[in-house]
């Protein structure tokens, strides 16, 4: 699933489309997590004026309307031309006045293309926690959020009500780098540990964005370019390999239905 760096990279790669006018809208398959709106054709004639990211959502603002885009498990946008071959799971095509096409591709259909309105704002955006790269995500905030949570720290970090966009990859790497067991009860972390964790999450995410995110299977940005953060992974996806710090075999633990790779030597589980 694309995480915050991949969504941020996708948004950035779409910026050249700003101020271009939509000429036509083609829905090839409306079946996504929620159906593509039947009236999406009203985008025709409108310029794309703004692109922002909130959590793993892209907020696309046109002259009259706003849309909420989410990549789901396997979604991606691709900037193309009419000469480029269509793919089976290209669900939506926005064609701009200069002939450029913006195609939304989603084999597993867990993504969404919705109007940003009062209903979607209330349901999808309002419950979200702070952005991890914002000043609102700091040690004092995280300490208050975690002090009563008995779940493992990794589960807490992946809770969008606590902080948005810290998915499996970047939570795994942050905890590994700090020697914190992913199942360590969140409330047991000390204030110095929480400060270090906030700083490490910010560092990891910034670095991942600089490298274009992680291409583990088929992720590319809208220009078809791969990310390279996966080349720096020390724990995620490396279960059974040797720890780079102590040469102990890395182990895999299932937490919240997600695989969590850790080093039993460098990341011991500590009880109060």
From Swiss-Prot:
SUPFAM superfamilies: Glucocorticoid receptor-like (DNA-binding domain) (SSF57716), N-terminal domain of MutM-like DNA repair proteins (SSF81624), S13-like H2TH domain (SSF46946)
Zinc finger (FPG-type): 234-268
Note on how the cofactor is bound: Binds 1 zinc ion per subunit.
Key words of the record: DNA damage, DNA repair, DNA-binding, Glycosidase, Hydrolase, Lyase, Metal-binding, Multifunctional enzyme, Zinc, Zinc-finger
EC id: 3.2.2.23, 4.2.99.18
Necessary cofactors: Zn(2+)
GO molecular function, one term: zinc ion binding
GO biological process: base-excision repair
Ranges in a coiled coil: none
Catalytic activity entry: Hydrolysis of DNA containing ring-opened 7-methylguanine residues, releasing 2,6-diamino-4-hydroxy-5-(N-methyl)formamidopyrimidine; 2'-deoxyribonucleotide-(2'-deoxyribose 5'-phosphate)-2'-deoxyribonucleotide-DNA = a 3'-end 2'-deoxyribonucleotide-(2,3-dehydro-2,3-deoxyribose 5'-phosphate)-DNA + a 5'-end 5'-phospho-2'-deoxyribonucleoside-DNA + H(+)
Pfam short name (any one): zf-FPG_IleRS
Purpose: Involved in base excision repair of DNA damaged by oxidation or by mutagenic agents. Acts as a DNA glycosylase that recognizes and removes damaged bases. Has a preference for oxidized purines, such as 7,8-dihydro-8-oxoguanine (8-oxoG). Has AP (apurinic/apyrimidinic) lyase activity and introduces nicks in the DNA strand. Cleaves the DNA backbone by beta-delta elimination to generate a single-strand break at the site of the removed base with both 3'- and 5'-phosphates.
HAMAP family associated with the record: Fapy_DNA_glycosyl (MF_00103)
NCBIfam families listed in its UniProt record: fpg, PRK01103.1
Subunit comment: Monomer.
Family classification: Belongs to the FPG family.
Descriptive protein name: Formamidopyrimidine-DNA glycosylase
Gene coding for it: mutM
